[in-house]
Amino acid sequence: MVGQLSEGAIAAIMQKGDTNIKPILQVINIRPITTGNSPPRYRLLMSDGLNTLSSFMLATQLNPLVEEEQLSSNCVCQIHRFIVNTLKDGRRVVILMELEVLKSAEAVGVKIGNPVPYNEGLGQPQVAPPAPAASPAASSRPQPQNGSSGMGSTVSKAYGASKTFGKAAGPSLSHTSGGTQSKVVPIASLTPYQSKWTICARVTNKSQIRTWSNSRGEGKLFSLELVDESGEIRATAFNEQVDKFFPLIEVNKVYYFSKGTLKIANKQFTAVKNDYEMTFNNETSVMPCEDDHHLPTVQFDFTGIDDLENKSKDSLVDIIGICKSYEDATKITVRSNNREVAKRNIYLMDTSGKVVTATLWGEDADKFDGSRQPVLAIKGARVSDFGGRSLSVLSSSTIIANPDIPEAYKLRGWFDAEGQALDGVSISDLKSGGVGGSNTNWKTLYEVKSENLGQGDKPDYFSSVATVVYLRKENCMYQACPTQDCNKKVIDQQNGLYRCEKCDTEFPNFKYRMILSVNIADFQENQWVTCFQESAEAILGQNAAYLGELKDKNEQAFEEVFQNANFRSFIFRVRVKVETYNDESRIKATVMDVKPVDYREYGRRLVMSIRRSALM
């Protein structure tokens, strides 16, 4: 049975660092290594039939092989791709990047042969491997011959004589800006205890420059996410390094990075799977790398939408889903700094049929185009528990539309075949329902009352197609503070000035604001709702400033605006919550959004509902 293994492969790897071979080895033992909050790492003791070596490390993307028990003690596997890292003390670690289990542990049953431990420190002579075939590296896996299992006579073709390291292989030499040479090491091998190192990595994400100012001073920073074949790491530059490196570094380009400061990663602010993170310092060097074809792009560790309900609040996740629908971008004012930013909600669905609301901010919100229902892969979205489970896409998150990965093709195929006909079930509303258009949790007004929505500790949200049957125009408008961020009612001083108690200021003018009570109805029930500025303007088809002018100058025209709004139908997004006033509890319904009815989408949804009812 020894002939099944690539005898001498361990010596070839450890003495010459040969990464062009594809040896067949047996797993003797697997030991997990504690890595804090990061994915577990596994250390393997492997045999080539002559020697054993415990310096094999499994790349994290191969962890499922261990967790699903495909890779276990006594199994035989072929290593298709690996890298060799040399530690400070001269010892070598072999990181397994790609392998194939040729024979399960159950099929093999025992340790093959009588291998002895390889002693790297004694300079053990290399066992000469069999002569290589003409093109040993061209085959991606051993081909069975004469009904064999892919081992035996093909083993000698799995690897050849040792060669010098290739650019995609283990430690190589890179010239830094200082003219010296340093070894290129994998990201997975970086620790704070190393002083001289160089990595070759692809930039998969680059943040905008952010500034801060506090009692200790002010400054600026930007961050990067870097990836190579072994793993990923986050890097941050501050102040002078921002000026130096921000204009030079481009997303998706590959660079040599040297001499950064390594420290324990703050997992609160990054979804990057690494225990450490890098900070640029005065000695940091960044040099372009032209040979970039071998490096991967963004690494994802996807969480299914139906699994988000098990994730804790504020945790960071990678998610992939079809953009089922999306809302228009709106502007909101951030209270902490009075800065106006764009906000847009999008609705993502995966093969589970579950839908989650993800919120885009700033430039991501402004530039988003979901018209073709793209597949979106998002790395590092923050989980929120607002109304169930929802996601917030941070400035540090990475968004890729229609990524070239198997998960995206699988999702697109499913959606085109059957998913697009589903409403989906939202996990972003406490009482979730279907999804269609840009709203979730469809309810008739009768269902809202019969299901006691709004009676719990938290408010409930629903969407309904309803018709305006009455508008209470009395006291629907008030004179408000003219400043942008204040809507407080002003007091007419009767001297041409209007006083805002909140701002403690008098103004020569004011702005009109609306609070409109509307009775809406569908085929079963009716409901009084309160509409504030934007939703009231959408129903009436006029802005508050124009309506205020009509009210003062042309009462008849003002009346006609309200009459014309009667018996118009809309999609209402409503918040309901029980409120108590003077010991009397009642349901308060507030309109959060008003949109025109897309009758094609509405009809499709009704047809699907009828079909589901027919199957019950």
UniProtKB/Swiss-Prot annotation:
Q: Name one GO molecular function term.
A: single-stranded telomeric DNA binding
Kindly indicate which segments of the sequence are annotated as binding DNA. 197-281
Question: Which sequence positions carry the modification called Phosphothreonine?
Answer: T180, T191
The UniProt entry's GO CC annotations, sorted and at most eight, read: chromosome, telomeric region; DNA replication factor A complex; lateral element; male germ cell nucleus; nucleoplasm; nucleus; PML body; site of DNA damage
In this chain, composition skew of type Low complexity spans 134-145
Q: Which UniProt keywords apply?
A: Acetylation, ADP-ribosylation, Disease variant, DNA damage, DNA recombination, DNA repair, DNA replication, DNA-binding, Isopeptide bond, Metal-binding, Nucleus, Phosphoprotein, Ubl conjugation, Zinc, Zinc-finger
- Which sequence ranges does the entry mark as zinc finger (C4-type)? 481-503
InterPro entries given in the database record: Euk_RPA1_DBD_C (IPR047192), NA-bd_OB-fold (IPR012340), NA-bd_OB_tRNA (IPR004365), Rep_factor-A_C (IPR013955), Rep_factor-A_N (IPR007199), REPA_OB_2 (IPR031657), Rfa1 (IPR004591)
Q: Where are the N-acetylmethionine residues found in this chain?
A: M1
Summarize what the UniProt record says about post-translational modification: DNA damage-induced 'Lys-63'-linked polyubiquitination by PRPF19 mediates ATRIP recruitment to the RPA complex at sites of DNA damage and activation of ATR. Ubiquitinated by RFWD3 at stalled replication forks in response to DNA damage: ubiquitination by RFWD3 does not lead to degradation by the proteasome and promotes removal of the RPA complex from stalled replication forks, promoting homologous recombination.
Cite the record's note on assembly: Component of the canonical replication protein A complex (RPA), a heterotrimer composed of RPA1, RPA2 and RPA3. Also a component of the aRPA, the alternative replication protein A complex, a trimeric complex similar to the replication protein A complex/RPA but where RPA1 and RPA3 are associated with RPA4 instead of RPA2. The DNA-binding activity may reside exclusively on the RPA1 subunit. Interacts with PRPF19; the PRP19-CDC5L complex is recruited to the sites of DNA repair where it ubiquitinates the replication protein A complex (RPA). Interacts with RIPK1.
Q: Which family does it belong to?
A: Belongs to the replication factor A protein 1 family.
Protein name per Swiss-Prot or TrEMBL: Replication protein A 70 kDa DNA-binding subunit
Source organism per entry reads Homo sapiens (Human)
- Phylogenetic lineage: Eukaryota, Metazoa, Chordata, Craniata, Vertebrata
